Amino acid sequence: MIYENLLRPLLFRLDPETAHELSLSALRLAAKLGPANPLKQSLPTSPRTVMGLEFPNPIGLAAGLDKNGDCIDGLAALGFGFLEIGTVTPRPQPGNPRPRLFRVPEAGALVNRMGFNNSGVAHLIARVRQTRYRGILGINIGKNLTTPVERALDDYREGLKAVYPYAHYVTLNVSSPNTPGLRSLQFGALLDELLDGLMGEREELTAQHGKRVPLALKVAPDMDSREIKALAGAVVRHGVDAVIATNTTASRDGVEGLEHADEAGGLSGKPLFLRSTEVVARLADALQGRAPIIACGGVFSGADAVAKFEAGASLVQVYTGFIYRGPALLAEIGRVVAAL
């Protein structure tokens, strides 16, 4: 409640990206206090086994909040059952020009066109090697803007090789709306080529490192039933270990006429909830248990998390809900999940 009633009003007076950077800095500083960290909280244990990994609870941080792995220890102290960092690209890139992150508070939403701004995979690995965190860490990888879609496999392969020794699972981000052409990798021959190449690469990395790291595919909410079935078929055919549903949406349903709603970029938060949950349900129907689903999109309460599980998800991730509600959201979901 301290966050929602005191800190959030102060942060929301700032530019969204400045507030984001300040929040991460505060979490980093708090983590250095160890047991005296005033933000530290423990959630009830609600173990889940997904992708062959043991999760202490099913509540994760979605990729995008800590793109560079700069705040792993600070975020871990909040009670997450797992963290996903990134999206990271092989080479550093600045992303799109500012402003590129916008709040739509009347709708509990954000619009972002960040454009995979990150410090590159070498920086992220250095941060991961420094962390004290020993929980489940996912690393989300993407392609550089300057790499054409036809050569996307090169970037994903390079990213996978680099992060493989340090990740509990690796997410292939093929669904951001802010990198031109990226979403085409979700379909047809481009998806088959990408997955075929990366599954072959994983076989070699498994032999090299003596461990098999699961691969998850993060997908968009803006797919029709035919596209969802085709994607599910590719997931099963290539042996993808999980699907993360979903990324942000290009739709503006539910935010029409609101300030910043028409900004270019992906929409996240409450307006995404129904659309993303429907994708979870359709994927669950198409997959028939052959790959687990990690739900992401519009989770603002314990009831929202339960709805994702009922739709067929095994785990949930939060981002925009966490921006609006802070650590109290995790505590609420933890209580509700423990009571199931």
From Swiss-Prot:
Which transformation does this protein catalyse, written as a reaction?
(S)-dihydroorotate + a quinone = orotate + a quinol
Location of the active site: 176
Cofactor remark from the record: Binds 1 FMN per subunit.
> Could you tell me which SUPFAM superfamilies the record lists for this protein?
FMN-linked oxidoreductases
Cofactor dependence = FMN
The UniProt annotation places substrate binding at: 67, 112-116, 173, 178, 247-248
For this record, the Gene Ontology CC terms, alphabetical, are: cytoplasm; plasma membrane
Q: Which superkingdom is the protein from?
A: Bacteria
Protein family = Belongs to the dihydroorotate dehydrogenase family. Type 2 subfamily.
Q: Which HAMAP family match?
A: DHO_dh_type2
**What name goes with this protein?**
Dihydroorotate dehydrogenase (quinone)
Task: Kindly list the organism's lineage.
Answer: Bacteria, Pseudomonadati, Pseudomonadota, Gammaproteobacteria, Methylococcales
The gene designation is: pyrD
